[in-house]
Amino acid sequence: MNNKEMKARQEKIRNFSIIAHIDHGKSTLADRILEKTNTVSSREMQDQLLDSMDLERERGITIKLNAIELNYTAKDGEIYTFHLIDTPGHVDFTYEVSRSLAACEGAVLVVDAAQGIEAQTLANVYLALDNDLEILPVINKIDLPAADPERVRTEIEDVIGIDASEAVLASAKAGIGIEDILEQVVEYVPAPSGDIEAPLKALIFDSIYDSYRGVVLNIRVIDGVVRPGDKIQMMSNGKTFDVTEVGVFSPKPIARDYLMVGDVGYITASIKTVQDTRVGDTVTLADNPAAEALPGYRKMNPMVYCGLYPIDTSRYNDLREALEKLQLNDAALQFEPETSQALGFGFRCGFLGLLHMDVVQERLEREFNLELITTAPSVIYHVNKTDGTTVVVDNPAEFPEPVTIESVEEPYVKAQIMVPNDYVGAVMELSQRKRGEFITMDYLDDYRVNVVYEIPLSEIVFDFFDKLKSSTKGYASLDYEMAGYRTSRLVKMDILLNAEKVDALSFIVHRDFAFERGKAIVEKLKKLIPRQQFEVPVQAAIGQKIVARSDIKALRKNVLAKCYGGDVSRKRKLLEKQKEGKKRMKQIGSVEVPQEAFMAVLKMDDQDNAK
């Protein structure tokens, strides 16, 4: 194909994403679009087709972005090439959304006709506006009994400030309005603006590791053309590779002769090691490189840290390899080696939130057959010491001794909670209980309120989301962003088993809640840790001071069973002898701590948490 034909084809390319809050129908809409454009035969069609991970199907959520090429014959008779990128809706995966939006010119904004705009809808719209995308509003689920499309239309105009007069009314499930959406994409989403004759410039927006082909790069070509046989160069580290195959996903990979401006597809180039590529890097040709790299992505900083340890310590290196391969596919994951006296060798991992942590742990266990122990998550604290230095601590076990601490600062987040009027009281009560500070409250319309609080991240990390959902019957939605550090009265609480500290069970707590939290955890551990042959005291301590204690009673054999009658001193002698044995055992005995005990520090029951 010569340059002229390529330029004509470029005019017919449309790249767009589907963005929405969780459960507003993104993946179902993507399914209908695939059916409508005959990309997938009805025999191969299945619900949530683009959610290829088992985990995504089970949980009914999208975790990974997915890019796919479709051909659509518009009403004007022309054939257009669409690149559709399905994105996640959960706040933990905002990074995936920002990456997919950088590869598009337009975004289809799906809003539930009954629920209206939610917190994540807004967050994703702002990301789309940052990328200068054309936004096409779609009001979905109009066949629901509670649907009120006109209210949602005014909400879109008032809250987001975009014209919704031409918003498509659709029902992805029933297949209503799908053609109107595709026609709007043709009409309103601009064609890619790159230059076909310029040196190659392509953005890596995702990558996966294939054990046969090495690293497979998912790219969006911004300028130029790339073909098999070309020598490509990574602009961040200058490494070069020979392209072996280029192609697109439709939804299965299909090899092509070239990828040109505006195409969204994949490249394989025998890239063997995971470290050679980075999501957000720019690919160019080695013999005709681009003058400057694309802006790429801002690096995501983890919000939550936890320790991951293999139950079988000999699989430490397998865990390292698994994390490296997962990092290719999940750029927001960070990790570094660490050791624990209780758990041996493992990794300290950083995540964007609890759901992200959960998903990574499950993927490691499923895709790499690892058995893992996870320690309770914690956030990053800044500890100002008496000698004038400041230490950054992400692991409670590394918290300095209380006598050396001048003050401790913890991260706060600005939480936007969208909630129906009836539940405002419940949300405010929960936020106050979690040490939140009220900032402001806006009425979006007669039914919905946007409540803004500043809350310590450590409180959000534990169980805020679950509690928010249960106290508002699932109607509230949450979005949060960092709001800096503040000084708080925090202390480190150690858990002692049989008078020995278990470093993996330590956690940071606000001084006002230390006593209740310590007491609750000690009681919980007492139930979870199996009884031993000797009595085991479980203690919670701040520094040298014990604040709570509970004893796990010993299992004991009835040594008097064979002692029929006889003198009482004989019975006493047997009991004393047993007592001596237990004492000796206690000095050398070690206590096995089950995985549930580590998670107990995390998930305290409601009555434990009445704080």
Curated annotation (Swiss-Prot):
Q: What is its EC number?
A: 3.6.5.n1
Family affiliation:
Belongs to the TRAFAC class translation factor GTPase superfamily. Classic translation factor GTPase family. LepA subfamily.
**Record flagged with keyword Cell membrane:** yes
Q: How does it sit in the membrane?
A: Peripheral membrane protein
tr-type G domain: which residues? 11-193
Give the source species. Enterococcus faecalis (strain ATCC 700802 / V583)
SMART domains given for it?
EFG_C
- Primary role: Required for accurate and efficient protein synthesis under certain stress conditions. May act as a fidelity factor of the translation reaction, by catalyzing a one-codon backward translocation of tRNAs on improperly translocated ribosomes. Back-translocation proceeds from a post-translocation (POST) complex to a pre-translocation (PRE) complex, thus giving elongation factor G a second chance to translocate the tRNAs correctly. Binds to ribosomes in a GTP-dependent manner.
Task: Quote the catalytic activity from the record.
Answer: GTP + H2O = GDP + phosphate + H(+)
Q: Does the keyword Nucleotide-binding apply?
A: yes
Entries under Pfam families matching the protein: EFG_C, GTP_EFTU, GTP_EFTU_D2, LepA_C
GO biological process assignments: positive regulation of translation
Identify the enzyme class: hydrolase
PANTHER family of this UniProt entry? Answer: TRANSLATION FACTOR GUF1 HOMOLOG, CHLOROPLASTIC, TRANSLATION FACTOR GUF1-RELATED
Q: What is this protein called?
A: Elongation factor 4
Q: Where in the cell is it found?
A: Cell membrane
Keywords from the named record: Cell membrane, GTP-binding, Hydrolase, Membrane, Nucleotide-binding, Protein biosynthesis
- The signal sequence is none
Q: InterPro entries annotated for this entry?
A: EF-4, EFG_III/V, EFG_V-like, EFTu-like_2, G_TR_CS, LepA_C_sf, LepA_CTD, LepA_IV
What GO cellular-component annotations does this UniProt entry give?
plasma membrane
